[in-house]
């Protein structure tokens, strides 16, 4: 399934509490700001992603090319015969922050995920399309706990670091009804991409820089690394995110921002 590697967003931010809207990065950026001693915050974020097409080694690949690839896990059928069409993901994230001191902010995040995938099935021998089916999974996906630590703060620039752990708590053995290449319906283990977790623990390390251009203009950069330090038979690959954003303050409670994201994820490690 082809994923989006470069994302550009135009975001409108509204603050309904005491802080200024420009003081918070675009909604897709996590761990972007710190709080003063005794301050706390609760957040609820919703996002949606849809993907179409397939890729191999970073290049687009057609259904016909997939159907001549050897089945790596079985000789029946000998070739891959079930091909994804499109996939959607809905994510709901509940988070909280609390600052015990001016230089340390504690943060937690939990995510609920809903996945849906449409697939085509091709006959094991004749290789003709015999139909399509849908598989889905939804539940709590992961929990994370982090500490944000102030590194350097000046009049117009601030640096802080993030160190934390992310726990995958979603089911890694989700099953669903599958239309098989023999034109039968069977209850089977869903593919890796449809699983809600991998029973892994990941170390989270990040660095964020915020620069104030003027009272109405700010600029920010952030890099975050997710490295697996404990896993079972298989786990999703390590991830790296880089975000760069610009914000313009329309008023105290309203700002406009644009964000550029680059992301990289390594291949799945191991197999089930």
Describe the residue ranges of each PLM region.
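Outer-membrane beta-barrel proteins
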Residues: 27-31, 50-56, 100-102, 116-121, 146-154, 170-175, 230-234, ...
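Repeated loop/turn-to-beta-strand initiation elements of outer-membrane beta-barrel proteins
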Residues: 40, 103-108, 155-159, 216-219, ...
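Outer-membrane pore/translocation modules
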Residues: 111-228
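Outer membrane beta-barrel transmembrane domains
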Residues: 55, 62-76, 231-272
């Amino acid at each position: 399934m082809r994923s989006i590697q470069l994302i550009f967003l135009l975001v409108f931010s509204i603050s309904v509490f005491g802080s200024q809207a420009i003081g918070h990065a675009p909604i897709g950026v996590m761990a972007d700001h710190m709080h003063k001693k005794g301050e706390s915050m609760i957040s609820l974020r919703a996002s949606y992603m849809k993907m179409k097409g397939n890729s191999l080694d970073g290049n687009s690949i057609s259904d016909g090319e997939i159907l001549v690839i050897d089945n790596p896990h079985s000789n029946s059928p000998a070739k891959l015969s079930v091909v994804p069409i499109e996939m959607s993901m809905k994510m709901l994230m509940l988070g909280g922050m609390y600052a015990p001191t001016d230089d340390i902010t504690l943060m937690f995040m939990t995510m609920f995920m809903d996945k849906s995938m449409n697939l085509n099935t091709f006959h094991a021998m004749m290789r003709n399309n015999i139909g399509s089916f849908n598989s889905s999974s939804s539940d709590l996906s992961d929990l994370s706990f982090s500490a944000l630590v102030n590194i350097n703060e000046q009049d117009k620039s601030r640096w802080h670091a993030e160190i934390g752990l992310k726990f995958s708590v979603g089911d890694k053995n989700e099953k669903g009804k599958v239309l098989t290449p023999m034109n039968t319906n069977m209850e089977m283990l869903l593919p890796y991409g449809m699983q809600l977790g991998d029973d892994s623990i990941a170390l989270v390390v990040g660095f964020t820089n915020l620069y104030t251009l003027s009272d109405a203009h700010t600029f920010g950069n952030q890099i975050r690394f997710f490295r697996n330090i404990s896993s079972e038979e298989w786990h999703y690959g390590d991830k790296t995110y880089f975000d760069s954003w610009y914000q313009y303050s329309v008023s105290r409670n309203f700002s406009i921002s644009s964000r550029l994201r680059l992301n990289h994820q390594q291949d799945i490690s191991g197999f089930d």
